[in-house]
């Protein structure tokens, strides 16, 4: 059928109505075969290119997935960093407030220090014992004359201690005052004990006057009796309490009577 169709059609270059040669037919078939082969080759190349494009598309898709995952992790890390930055900012604000308060406290302390230095009342005590007492406090104080005269002597002793020591610290002044009061109380107790145990001062007894009818012998007999009465009484210890006003007078009266 093909040959008849080819034969029926006019061949270019051939005379009209003339027979068609087989050589032309073969050449045409060869051309057609070559064209088909080239077409197939091109289709194969296109298929290979399409496969390469599909692989590249798949690679691009995988890369896009990895990029999206990395973007998610980056967003999470950024969120954590922002939270940490907020916490650090809050801590920095709190630290700044504390620094401002400390600066204000330091300024107040500096102002107080300047005032104390200006007044001259700043003294640093490295070590002070609680029971420390000045050396003058251990000196033997004169025995007081009486309970009435203890009052004015106490402020004088405290004034001397304060003037000698010149300690502006209140605690030291309180300790000194307390020790002074304790010493005064102990002295009072000792004096009260001495007065309670000591014998009362004897009242001087004057000998009775002899009348005109008495003889001289009776007078000399009465005087030894008076002396015997006065001898057992011990003399008062004037050395222990020299300031008592009645002791010296009583001793003088006793000496005069014994001499008489």
Curated annotation (Swiss-Prot):
InterPro entries: Cavin_fam
PTM section of the record: In vitro, phosphorylated by PRKCD.
GO function terms (MF aspect): protein kinase C binding
Subcellular location: Cytoplasm; Membrane, Caveola; Cytoplasm, Cytosol
Bias type Acidic residues, positions: 157-168
Top-rank lineage group of the source organism: Eukaryota
Family: Belongs to the CAVIN family.
Composition bias type Pro residues, residue spans: 201-210
Region of interest (Disordered), ranges: 140-260
Region of interest called Interaction with CAV1, as start-end residue ranges on this chain: 135-201
Name the UniProt record assigns to this protein: Caveolae-associated protein 3
Keywords: Biological rhythms, Cytoplasm, Isopeptide bond, Membrane, Phosphoprotein, Tumor suppressor, Ubl conjugation
Residues bearing the modification Phosphoserine: 62, 70, 162-163, 171
GO cellular component: caveola; cytoplasm; cytosol; protein-containing complex
Cross-link Glycyl lysine isopeptide (Lys-Gly) (interchain with G-Cter in SUMO2), where in sequence: 128
One annotated GO biological process: negative regulation of phosphatidylinositol 3-kinase/protein kinase B signal transduction
One Pfam entry name: PTRF_SDPR
């Amino acid at each position: 059928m093909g040959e008849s169709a080819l034969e029926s059609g006019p061949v270019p270059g051939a005379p009209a109505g003339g027979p068609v040669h087989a050589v032309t037919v073969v050449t045409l078939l060869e051309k057609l075969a070559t064209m088909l082969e080239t077409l197939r080759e091109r289709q194969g190349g296109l298929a290979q290119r399409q496969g390469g494009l599909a692989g590249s598309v798949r690679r691009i898709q995988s890369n896009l997935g990895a990029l999206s995952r990395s973007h998610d992790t980056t967003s999470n890390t950024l969120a954590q960093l922002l939270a940490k930055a907020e916490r650090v900012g809050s801590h920095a604000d709190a630290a700044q407030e504390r620094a401002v308060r400390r600066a204000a406290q330091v300024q107040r302390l500096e102002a107080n220090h300047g005032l104390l230095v200006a007044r001259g009342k700043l003294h640093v005590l490295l070590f002070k014992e609680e029971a420390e007492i000045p050396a003058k406090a251990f000196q033997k104080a004169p025995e007081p004359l009486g309970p009435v005269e203890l009052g004015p002597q106490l402020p004088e002793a405290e004034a001397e201690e304060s003037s000698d020591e010149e300690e502006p610290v209140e605690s030291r002044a309180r300790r000194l005052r307390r020790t002074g009061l304790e010493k005064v109380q102990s002295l009072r107790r000792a004096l009260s004990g001495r007065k309670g145990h000591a014998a009362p001062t004897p009242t001087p007894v004057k000998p009775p006057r002899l009348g005109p009818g008495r003889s001289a012998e009776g007078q000399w007999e009465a005087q030894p009796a008076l002396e015997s009465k006065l001898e057992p009484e011990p003399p008062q210890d004037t050395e222990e309490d020299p300031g008592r006003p009645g002791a010296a007078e009583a001793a003088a009266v006793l000496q005069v009577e014994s001499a008489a």
